[in-house]
């Protein structure tokens, strides 16, 4: 009996000693690095806002899962019929206790339309929005191919209409939202402090306190992750990601998203451009410039952007014999030195690989690193020979990306009038099957003219404390995170 009692007392003592640890873990503050300094807390009016803060304070109709697929958020379901999409709302409540209604969604949409800079976030995909009843809202799409679900996950935060005062100082407080956290304030270091919404409609968050701290450099972020002063480094570079593999307690994420890197070729000679297209070894680029992460492009644009067009047009990438055949047909001046303009270290590294490949077929190049503003001006003017560019976001599809060939909407590339007209025409075709066929023809011609040379799907990176659960890999590509879904491991 004494032995049993001693064992029970020992268990009680262990639990007593352990209890403060569990309490400390439950009360632990989650610290997240911001992407942008928060100087504004109203998502309906233009200002500097951070996605981590916005998604903590406000809900969106849709969300992303780990792989970037769209899943229900404030909306529990939806169905598309032609250019109409009907959303059915969950039973959700704002932080003041009022029910979230379809009219609040319409109000949020219409308020954004009144902002001269933010309105394009809506007009790119939607022509209108109306409430059918308190739980049902219908959007009229601007076109039937737009990625409306992604726009809704990223850009339409739902704000309560009742009590909304447009004259409020949004630099010091947000409007009323329905998110998992409540705004507590911002200190002089620009750290935003949030506390859990105890009445959150989708369940009270496990982590009760969140701090979103100002941006820091990668080296400082990695040290802070390892010392426990930071839990999420929202976006890091390739070198920092590689370093996470050697760090205890830190998890690095590499995510192939909606962006691919390619080469703009402004040389007005199609055989020259075809030679360049086939001279570049994409596998070498991935191995050297991405440390084996990422993948050589199989399509004109990133796999996630290509969607149903992925694999519709097959093309030959690296083929040295074909490159030599094309350069032999070219009338371009091979005695001159062509410039590859870059603006950062990563594109400069890729340029070195391309420079070596082009030298094999007799094209001499010089790498010129410009300040980003100068580089951009030269790019938009076509005042360069080559440049390496990363293109694509989760909110665009192939029809949208083809606009790079339209000088009125994209870049002054040396392409035919026929291609420009096809690019302009394809998105206007209402019938889905007819538009698909026309887009495929447009891609085929774009590949032939080779003014855009797809290189590799470009991964993006972030890192977090390994004890953190509920993270999503897609954060690396979108900077969207859901702190309300996170918890610390016991």
Predicted features, each with a name:
Residues 8, 278, 295-329, 347-349:
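Structural transition elements
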Residues 33-80, 110, 176-177:
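N-terminal lobe/hinge region of extracytoplasmic solute-binding protein
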Residues 79, 84, 121-163:
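Surface-exposed binding/hinge segments that line
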């Amino acid at each position: 009996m004494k032995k049993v009692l001693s064992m029970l007392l020992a268990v009680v003592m262990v639990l007593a000693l352990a209890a403060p640890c569990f309490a400390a873990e439950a009360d632990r503050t989650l610290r997240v690095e911001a992407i942008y300094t928060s100087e504004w807390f109203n998502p309906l009016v233009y200002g500097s806002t951070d996605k981590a803060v916005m998604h903590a304070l406000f809900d969106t109709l849709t969300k992303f899962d780990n792989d970037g697929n769209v899943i229900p958020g404030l909306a529990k379901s939806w169905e598309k019929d032609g250019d109409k999409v009907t959303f059915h709302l969950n039973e959700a409540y704002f932080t003041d206790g009022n029910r979230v209604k379809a009219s609040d969604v319409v109000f949020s949409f219409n308020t954004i339309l009144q902002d001269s800079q933010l309105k394009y976030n809506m007009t790119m995909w939607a022509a209108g929005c109306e409430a059918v009843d308190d739980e049902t809202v219908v959007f009229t799409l601007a076109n039937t191919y737009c990625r409306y679900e992604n726009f809704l996950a990223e850009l339409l935060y739902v704000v309560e209409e009742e009590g909304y005062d447009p004259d409020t100082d949004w630099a010091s407080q947000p409007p009323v939202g329905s998110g998992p956290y409540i705004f507590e304030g911002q200190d002089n270091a620009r750290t935003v402090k949030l506390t859990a919404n105890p009445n959150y409609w989708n369940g009270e968050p496990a982590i009760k306190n969140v701090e979103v701290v100002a941006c820091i450099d990668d080296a400082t972020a990695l040290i802070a992750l390892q010392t426990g002063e930071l839990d999420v480094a929202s976006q890091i570079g390739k070198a920092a990601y590689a370093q996470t593999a050697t760090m205890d307690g830190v998890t690095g994420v590499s995510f192939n998203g909606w962006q691919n890197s390619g080469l703009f070729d402004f040389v007005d000679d199609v055989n020259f451009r075809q030679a360049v297209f086939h001279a570049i070894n994409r596998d070498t680029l991935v191995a050297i410039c991405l440390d084996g992460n990422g993948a050589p492009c199989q399509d004109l644009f990133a796999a996630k952007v290509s969607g149903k067009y992925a694999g519709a047009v097959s093309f030959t990438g690296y083929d040295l014999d074909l490159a030599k055949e094309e350069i032999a047909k070219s009338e371009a001046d091979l005695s001159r030195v062509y410039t590859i303009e870059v603006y950062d270290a990563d594109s400069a590294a890729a340029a070195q690989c391309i420079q070596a490949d082009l030298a094999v077929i007799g094209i001499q190049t010089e790498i010129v690193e410009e300040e980003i503003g100068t580089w951009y001006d030269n790019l938009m003017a076509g005042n360069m020979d080559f440049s390496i560019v990363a293109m694509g976001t989760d909110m665009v599809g192939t029809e949208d990306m083809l606009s790079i060939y339209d000088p009125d909407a994209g870049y002054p590339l040396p392409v035919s009038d026929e291609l420009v007209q096809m690019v302009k025409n394809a998105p206007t075709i209402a019938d889905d099957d007819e538009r698909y066929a026309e887009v495929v023809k447009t891609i085929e011609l774009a590949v032939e003219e080779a003014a855009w040379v797809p290189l590799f799907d470009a991964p993006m990176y972030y890192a977090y404390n390994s004890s953190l659960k509920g993270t999503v890999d897609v954060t690396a590509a979108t900077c969207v995170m859901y702190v309300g879904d996170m918890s610390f491991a016991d």
